[in-house]
């Protein structure tokens, strides 16, 4: 049974009006005719190809609304050059729902060096260019052009992480809320099942979008009600961190758009307050001035109970791409079709990651029964299944059923992480439920192997030697990807990641368990280059650690400042929002912005690549560490240069939109067209 910090007013499926499910949600008039529909109640417009599977947001929302009795159509990756493709299913009777897809469209389209990507894992054939940049804005505007009087509701991760004024890496400026640019009526942030059901039912009952200002997880433009008292974000940066709270209805006023555009400390303060007001148990509404209007954000949605999670994942998905794609491969589908999501949310709080800002810090778990039913569906219905579950987990592999021991403490907590700088004593870190689940899945008829491919929080895993033994003995296939991200305390503190000692402890336990099981397994560590707070010396020390431990890392990535992440605020402002932000007294952070330095940091991670040796030799000399140039084991790069090498890709300039396309790399791996 779930112990909720705060209960929803009504269960998610309380108003369900089951209708016969469509084989696939229709994407054409012909499919609507076959279903006997004269119109759609709701049309969902998405930047992804339509795959009817719970790993794809439009499928979850579409099937959930179908279960509420609505006729739901899908328009996937429409031609955005005119409004006509948005009229393909006719005028929706209730609303247009618009999502950029499973990824922010700019993250999906450009690398960390702002180079154009050639492919798109969420498109048939893996072809890039099937969605516009900032596609949530473009689609919403085309929906409004197609049918001016139909409400437009934004959702998905792109809208969710751009819900307030935010720094945009690709334009290198602060942009206003996506709700303003899209000219939509409402924005639903986070996992929006509760909100979208209530919005749909109330709009269908005749309410206007502006009247839906009491729904959690909703952002809209509205005036501050007279019965609310305002608490300015500046007041939360007092020595007691705003511990003295005003009684009654209170809204926190963030620094205005015009202020955060000009004042970087004001931007950092807004980021800090937003993240501290993310607990559904104690978060208050936020308001931010945009010109002559107030953008209002209601508190975050109430997490789903296990029964509600089961209801969502048990909906009648076809578990396949829409037939209109024929035999075309959709890479994202091929990657996940034999995997199972068992939970949502993450309490790690890594500053470079936006999972917490979208899914929340509270873990939402499926029951064992629901998970086992899905595995049986994969076994029985998914073509090509050979008995191997490719991955079982969620945003992390091993937070299943972990929670605060005391709901009252959880409801009052404003910590950005439950595991940094140390694991909170109020956190239940037992892996027993997860171990039991693994065993039941392995016992399922027809299942030969269950893999845990990535996402293990090693700082949690070392709390359970039994879990590591279970993992290594049964759920690793040759190697396990793991993410220490760095070795040096400076950048790790800015990332809110544990020290390298925790990784070393996990590696010792992993290796011992592998030896005991008679296996030859390996860890593949991930590292980030150019994260805020990282110095050239930090990267040099990381490279020395890699060489000492005989790692030649291909799995590296350059920090990408994604919308709303705390590390993005550090990158943009040079201020650390993890600490109190006060004019003239804020904790400063070094941000690595120059292309030359960013690529130097990545070159340190690939110290073994001869193409990187010239730039590394030059940097080591400038740092006064020419002693690390030579062929001894304790030296980093040799003095000689093999013929035909030394032309590092780091000298190439990024491609801007409209420029010549080129090959690109992701996490250090060459990706072909």
Swiss-Prot record:
Keywords: 4Fe-4S, Iron, Iron-sulfur, Metal-binding, S-adenosyl-L-methionine
Keyword presence, Transmembrane: no
Protein name (record): UPF0313 protein blr7973
Stretches the record annotates as Disordered: 632-673
HAMAP family linked to this entry: UPF0313
Cross-referenced Gene3D superfamilies: tm_1862 like domain
Molecular function as annotated in GO: 4 iron, 4 sulfur cluster binding; catalytic activity; iron ion binding
Residues involved in [4Fe-4S] cluster binding: 346, 350, 353
Highest classification ranks of the organism: Bacteria, Pseudomonadati, Pseudomonadota, Alphaproteobacteria, Hyphomicrobiales
InterPro entries with a match to the protein in the record: Elp3/MiaA/NifB-like_rSAM (IPR006638), Methylthiotransferase_CS (IPR020612), rSAM (IPR007197), rSAM_horseshoe (IPR023404), UPF0313 (IPR022946), UPF0313_C (IPR024560), UPF0313_N (IPR013704)
Cofactor note as given: Binds 1 [4Fe-4S] cluster. The cluster is coordinated with 3 cysteines and an exchangeable S-adenosyl-L-methionine.
Cofactor(s) recorded in Swiss-Prot or TrEMBL: [4Fe-4S] cluster
S-adenosyl-L-methionine found in the keyword field: yes
Species name: Bradyrhizobium diazoefficiens (strain JCM 10833 / BCRC 13528 / IAM 13628 / NBRC 14792 / USDA 110)
């Amino acid at each position: 049974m779930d112990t909720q910090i705060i209960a929803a007013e009504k269960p998610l499926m309380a108003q369900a009006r089951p209708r016969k499910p469509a084989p696939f949600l229709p994407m054409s008039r012909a499919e609507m005719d076959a279903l006997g529909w004269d119109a759609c109640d709701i049309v969902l417009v998405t930047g992804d190809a339509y795959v009817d599977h719970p790993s794809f947001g439009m499928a979850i929302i579409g099937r959930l609304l179908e279960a509420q009795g609505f006729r739901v159509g899908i328009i996937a990756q429409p031609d955005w050059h005119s409004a006509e493709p948005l009229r393909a299913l006719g005028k929706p009777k209730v609303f247009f729902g618009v999502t950029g897809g499973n990824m922010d469209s700019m993250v999906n389209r450009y690398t960390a060096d702002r180079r154009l990507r050639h492919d798109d894992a969420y498109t048939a054939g893996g072809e890039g260019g099937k969605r516009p940049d900032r596609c949530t804005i473009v689609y919403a505007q085309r929906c409004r052009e197609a049918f001016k009087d139909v409400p437009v509701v934004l959702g998905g991760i792109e809208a969710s992480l751009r819900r307030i004024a935010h720094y945009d890496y690709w334009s290198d400026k602060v942009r206003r809320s996506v709700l303003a640019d899209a000219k939509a009526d409402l924005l639903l942030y986070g996992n929006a099942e509760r909100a979208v059901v209530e919005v749909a039912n109330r709009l269908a009952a005749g309410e206007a979008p502006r009247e839906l200002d009491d729904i959690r997880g909703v952002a809209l433009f509205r005036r501050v009600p007279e019965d609310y008292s305002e608490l300015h974000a500046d007041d939360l940066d007092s020595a007691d961190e705003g511990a003295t709270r005003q009684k009654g209805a209170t809204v926190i006023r963030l620094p205005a758009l015009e202020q955060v555009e000009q004042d970087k400390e004001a931007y950092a303060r807004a980021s800090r307050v937003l993240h501290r007001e993310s607990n559904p148990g104690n978060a208050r509404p936020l308001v931010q001035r945009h010109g002559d209007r107030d953008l209002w954000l209601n508190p975050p949605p109430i997490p789903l109970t296990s029964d509600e999670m089961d209801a969502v994942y048990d909906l009648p998905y076809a578990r396949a791409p829409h037939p209109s794609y024929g035999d075309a491969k959709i890479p994202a589908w091929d990657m996940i079709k034999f995997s199972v999501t068992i939970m949502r949310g993450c309490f790690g709080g890594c500053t470079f990651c936006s999972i917490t800002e979208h899914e929340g810090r509270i873990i939402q778990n499926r029951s064992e029964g629901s998970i086992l039913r899905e595995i049986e569906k994969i076994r029985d219905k998914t073509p090509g299944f050979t008995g191997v579950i490719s991955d079982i987990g969620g945003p992390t592999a091993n937070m299943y059923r972990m929670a605060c021991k005391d709901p009252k403490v959880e409801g009052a907590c404003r910590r950005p992480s439950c595991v940094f700088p140390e694991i909170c004593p109020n956190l239940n870190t037992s892996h027993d439920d997860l171990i039991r689940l693994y065993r039941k899945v392995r016992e399922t008829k027809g299942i030969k192997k269950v893999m845990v491919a990535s996402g293990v929080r090693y700082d949690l895993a070392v709390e359970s030697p039994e879990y590591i033994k279970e993992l290594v003995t049964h759920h690793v296939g040759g190697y396990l990807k793991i993410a220490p991200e760095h070795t040096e305390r400076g950048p790790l503190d800015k990332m809110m990641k544990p020290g390298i000692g925790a990784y070393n402890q996990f590696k010792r336990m992993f290796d011992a368990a592998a030896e005991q099981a008679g296996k030859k397994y390996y860890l593949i560590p991930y590292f980030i280059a150019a994260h805020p707070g990282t110095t050239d010396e930090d990267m040099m020390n990381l490279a020395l650690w890699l060489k000492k431990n005989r790692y030649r890392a291909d799995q590296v990535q350059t920090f990408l400042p994604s919308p709303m992440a705390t590390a993005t605020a550090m990158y943009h402002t040079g201020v650390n929002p993890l600490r109190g932000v006060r004019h003239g007294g804020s904790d400063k952070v070094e941000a690595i912005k120059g292309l030359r330095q960013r690529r130097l940091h990545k070159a340190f991670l690939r110290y073994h690549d001869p193409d990187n040796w010239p730039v590394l030799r030059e940097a080591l000399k400038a740092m006064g560490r020419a002693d690390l140039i030579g062929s001894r084991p304790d030296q980093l790069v040799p003095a000689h240069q093999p013929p035909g090498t030394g032309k590092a890709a780091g000298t190439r300039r990024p491609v801007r939109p409209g420029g010549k396309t080129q090959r690109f790399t992701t996490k250090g791996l060459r990706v072909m067209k």
